[in-house]
């Protein structure tokens, strides 16, 4: 898409600077060339218009790659309204390009918490009234939660939600268990072409980039502690190892802990004998006193707590590549220590008490992105080729749910369909095949004899649902 409209013709948006649209358009065109799966779906399904009639509320990082996602949804027939799921992650040129194309978007880099909530509200509302949306595309679950709590009547017309992240999936499963979830959900996060690409390979690329942009530090030879060794933690540990860091890992899951050991990382705990009793006495101060960089990757709360922050080496860098800013106890830091802004999304946290500080003091931590997503706060996030798989999954998930027409079902049928499910493996394989073609790769085809021997069809799916890639 390349249409550019003037603000006089269209004003259903709020971005930092609409004059950045031409820049955003140039970057979007480049991103399209690096997103073969998404563009392949656009070409494959444009004639059928499978999303014609879909009205999608979207809340996901408003980046250049998201611009390609949005315009793919529109090209397949959808109408959308958009906001960002993070106050620091918007690329203003991307938001401007989408607004200039006549698509409602409310996002800018550096929103306050109040502005963030206002932007989500503007996504939900059109001309001051709830939009007649019938689909949700979410990242982290804030949009889904707001609609359930503040606009429950809208749920009668909504066919479902597709969720991008681990954090959002946890929230959906919690809502389902409590009987609070009113629409079916597709767990995009656990599609193989999302979790292995975005969570693992994406973090491998973007974590070290963000730290270096934020600090200008040489990382080689320094000690890092990665908290968590799920897919995000695996990619993060590799990212730091690539820089020549001495990487240690902490984990609560024995299986992930075993994987860290097998991958050659030292498994440690910031707590003596691995037990956190909530006091400074349980902290392994000898360990944390040598750590130059700590990265949280878990999607859990206070995994880098106040006692750990007190024990960290002077001038250590602290950052998060999970979803929310509560992985690091930033609330404690705000209440008890002085913050000095070095530049946007980079703060010296003086551990000498609240209020004023001595600029020459050397007892400080360097906090990146205020504890929010470091790769989008201090850099530009994952490459287009990585996000290609995630967003192709989102498109197929939106088509899948929209075709199911949950909102039109009889009540008895609705209760059967109220689930949180992973995208069918056949669609996961479709995304992977488009990505392979983008690399110029050639996939070998099974013969009929070979397919029969392992109990699959020649066209796939090629693995049982229980297979772990």
UniProtKB/Swiss-Prot annotation:
<feature type="binding site">
    <location>
        <position position="63"/>
    </location>
    <ligand>
        <name>substrate</name>
    </ligand>
</feature>
<feature type="binding site">
    <location>
        <begin position="228"/>
        <end position="233"/>
    </location>
    <ligand>
        <name>NAD(+)</name>
    </ligand>
</feature>
<dbReference type="InterPro" id="IPR020082">
    <property type="entry name" value="S-Ado-L-homoCys_hydrolase_CS"/>
</dbReference>
<comment type="similarity">
    <text>Belongs to the adenosylhomocysteinase family.</text>
</comment>
<dbReference type="Pfam" id="PF00670">
    <property type="entry name" value="AdoHcyase_NAD"/>
</dbReference>
<feature type="binding site">
    <location>
        <position position="251"/>
    </location>
    <ligand>
        <name>NAD(+)</name>
    </ligand>
</feature>
<dbReference type="Pfam" id="PF05221">
    <property type="entry name" value="AdoHcyase"/>
</dbReference>
<comment type="pathway">
    <text>Amino-acid biosynthesis; L-homocysteine biosynthesis; L-homocysteine from S-adenosyl-L-homocysteine: step 1/1.</text>
</comment>
<feature type="binding site">
    <location>
        <begin position="165"/>
        <end position="167"/>
    </location>
    <ligand>
        <name>NAD(+)</name>
    </ligand>
</feature>
<keyword id="KW-0554">One-carbon metabolism</keyword>
<protein>
    <recommendedName>
        <fullName>Adenosylhomocysteinase</fullName>
        <ecNumber>3.13.2.1</ecNumber>
    </recommendedName>
</protein>
<dbReference type="GO" id="GO:0004013">
    <property type="term" value="F:adenosylhomocysteinase activity"/>
</dbReference>
<keyword id="KW-0378">Hydrolase</keyword>
<dbReference type="InterPro" id="IPR015878">
    <property type="entry name" value="Ado_hCys_hydrolase_NAD-bd"/>
</dbReference>
<dbReference type="GO" id="GO:0006730">
    <property type="term" value="P:one-carbon metabolic process"/>
</dbReference>
<dbReference type="GO" id="GO:0033353">
    <property type="term" value="P:S-adenosylmethionine cycle"/>
</dbReference>
<dbReference type="InterPro" id="IPR000043">
    <property type="entry name" value="Adenosylhomocysteinase-like"/>
</dbReference>
<feature type="binding site">
    <location>
        <position position="199"/>
    </location>
    <ligand>
        <name>NAD(+)</name>
    </ligand>
</feature>
<dbReference type="InterPro" id="IPR036291">
    <property type="entry name" value="NAD(P)-bd_dom_sf"/>
</dbReference>
<dbReference type="GO" id="GO:0005829">
    <property type="term" value="C:cytosol"/>
</dbReference>
<keyword id="KW-0520">NAD</keyword>
<feature type="binding site">
    <location>
        <position position="198"/>
    </location>
    <ligand>
        <name>substrate</name>
    </ligand>
</feature>
<feature type="binding site">
    <location>
        <begin position="321"/>
        <end position="323"/>
    </location>
    <ligand>
        <name>NAD(+)</name>
    </ligand>
</feature>
<dbReference type="GO" id="GO:0071269">
    <property type="term" value="P:L-homocysteine biosynthetic process"/>
</dbReference>
<comment type="function">
    <text>May play a key role in the regulation of the intracellular concentration of adenosylhomocysteine.</text>
</comment>
<feature type="binding site">
    <location>
        <position position="300"/>
    </location>
    <ligand>
        <name>NAD(+)</name>
    </ligand>
</feature>
<feature type="binding site">
    <location>
        <position position="164"/>
    </location>
    <ligand>
        <name>substrate</name>
    </ligand>
</feature>
<feature type="binding site">
    <location>
        <position position="194"/>
    </location>
    <ligand>
        <name>substrate</name>
    </ligand>
</feature>
<feature type="binding site">
    <location>
        <position position="375"/>
    </location>
    <ligand>
        <name>NAD(+)</name>
    </ligand>
</feature>
<keyword id="KW-0963">Cytoplasm</keyword>
<feature type="binding site">
    <location>
        <position position="139"/>
    </location>
    <ligand>
        <name>substrate</name>
    </ligand>
</feature>
<dbReference type="InterPro" id="IPR042172">
    <property type="entry name" value="Adenosylhomocyst_ase-like_sf"/>
</dbReference>
């Amino acid at each position: 898409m390349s249409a550019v409209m003037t603000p006089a013709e269209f004003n259903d948006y709020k971005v930092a600077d609409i004059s950045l649209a031409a820049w955003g358009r140039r970057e979007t065109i480049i991103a399209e060339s690096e997103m073969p799966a998404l563009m392949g779906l656009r070409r494959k399904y444009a004639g059928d218009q499978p999303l014609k009639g879909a009205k999608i509320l979207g809340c996901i990082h408003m980046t250049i790659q998201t611009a390609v996602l949005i315009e793919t949804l529109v090209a397949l027939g959808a109408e959308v309204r958009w906001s960002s799921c993070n106050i620091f992650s918007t690329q203003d040129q991307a938001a401007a390009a989408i607004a200039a194309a006549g698509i409602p978007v409310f996002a800018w880099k550096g929103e306050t918490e109040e502005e963030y909530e206002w932007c989500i509200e503007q996504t939900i509302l059109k001309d001051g009234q709830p939009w007649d949306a019938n689909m949700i595309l979410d990242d982290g679950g804030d949009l889904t939660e707001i609609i359930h709590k503040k606009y429950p009547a809208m749920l009668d017309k909504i066919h479902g939600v597709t969720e991008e992240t681990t954090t959002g999936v946890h929230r959906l499963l919690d809502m389902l268990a409590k009987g609070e979830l009113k629409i079916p959900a597709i767990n995009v996060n656990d599609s193989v072409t999302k979790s292995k690409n975005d969570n693992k390979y994406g973090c491998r690329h973007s974590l070290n980039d963000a730290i270096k942009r934020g600090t200008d530090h040489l990382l080689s030879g320094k000690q890092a502690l990665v908290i968590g060794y799920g897919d995000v933690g695996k990619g993060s540990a590799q990212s730091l190892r690539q820089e020549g860091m001495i990487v240690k890992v902490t984990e609560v899951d024995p299986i992930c802990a075993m994987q860290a050991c097998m991958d050659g990382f030292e498994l440690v705990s910031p707590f003596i004998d691995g037990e956190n009793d909530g006091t400074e006495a349980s902290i392994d101060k000898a360990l944390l006193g040598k750590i130059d960089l700590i990265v949280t990757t878990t999607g859990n709360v206070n995994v880098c707590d106040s006692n750990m922050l007190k024990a960290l080496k002077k001038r250590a860098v602290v950052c998060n590549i999970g979803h929310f800013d509560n992985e690091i106890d930033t609330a404690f830091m705000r209440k008890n220590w002085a913050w000095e802004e070095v530049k946007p999304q980079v703060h010296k946290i003086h551990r000498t008490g609240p209020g004023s500080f001595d600029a020459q003091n050397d007892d400080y931590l360097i906090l990146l992105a205020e504890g929010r997503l470091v790769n989008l706060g201090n850099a530009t996030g994952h490459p287009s080729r990585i996000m290609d798989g995630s967003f192709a999954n989102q498109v197929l998930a939106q088509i899948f749910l929209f075709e199911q027409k949950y909102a039109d079902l009889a009540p008895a049928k609705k209760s059967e369909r109220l689930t949180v499910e992973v995208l069918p493996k056949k669609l996961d394989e479709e995304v992977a095949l488009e990505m392979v073609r983008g690399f110029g790769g050639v996939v070998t085809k099974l013969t009929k004899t070979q397919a029969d021997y392992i109990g699959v069809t020649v066209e796939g799916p090629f693995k049982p649902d229980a297979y772990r890639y």
